Swiss-Prot record:
Organism: Pectobacterium atrosepticum (strain SCRI 1043 / ATCC BAA-672) (Erwinia carotovora subsp. atroseptica)
Pathway where it operates: Metabolic intermediate biosynthesis; chorismate biosynthesis; chorismate from D-erythrose 4-phosphate and phosphoenolpyruvate: step 3/7
GO MF term set: 3-dehydroquinate dehydratase activity
Site for Transition state stabilizer, residues: R21
EC numbers: 4.2.1.10
Signal peptide as annotated in the record: none
Keywords: Amino-acid biosynthesis, Aromatic amino acid biosynthesis, Lyase
Enzyme class: lyase
Protein name in the entry: 3-dehydroquinate dehydratase
Gene3D superfamilies: Dehydroquinase, class II
General function of this protein: Catalyzes a trans-dehydration via an enolate intermediate.
NCBIfam families recorded: aroQ, PRK05395.1-1, PRK05395.1-2, PRK05395.1-3, PRK05395.1-4
Amino acid sequence: MAENFHILLLNGPNLNLLGTREPDKYGNTTLADIVSELETQAQALNVKFSHLQSNAEHVLIDTIHQARGNTDFILINPAAFTHTSVALRDALLAVAIPFIEIHLSNVHAREPFRHHSYLSDVAVGVICGLGADGYQYALQTAVKRLSTSN
């Protein structure tokens, strides 16, 4: 049953500035708007949903470690840590919780240094370039995968 599932959303550095930061790339939707929409969607899907945004890599890693044993799926927009953080990758592998990597912009249509991800090859999937809607698609996919695997 979906009501037993817990899905954790993690957002990395600078995503607290959504809505005002480079709206041509990231849109005008704030992170609070995205989270509010996901909370509504999670309630409709009858799943527990929690969220954390941090600009600090160690906070995201500690949160991933704490998710072990009580979280069924992670949705993560690692932001700039996508391209730099082996530690974030190792944390996700260590807890063995399935996850979807999310990006608001199409990272493959941007600067070459953004084309590499330390997470995508170990993620269930990657959603990029679909703006805030990508988060909703990720949540729907996580619930569907959990529902069909149990």
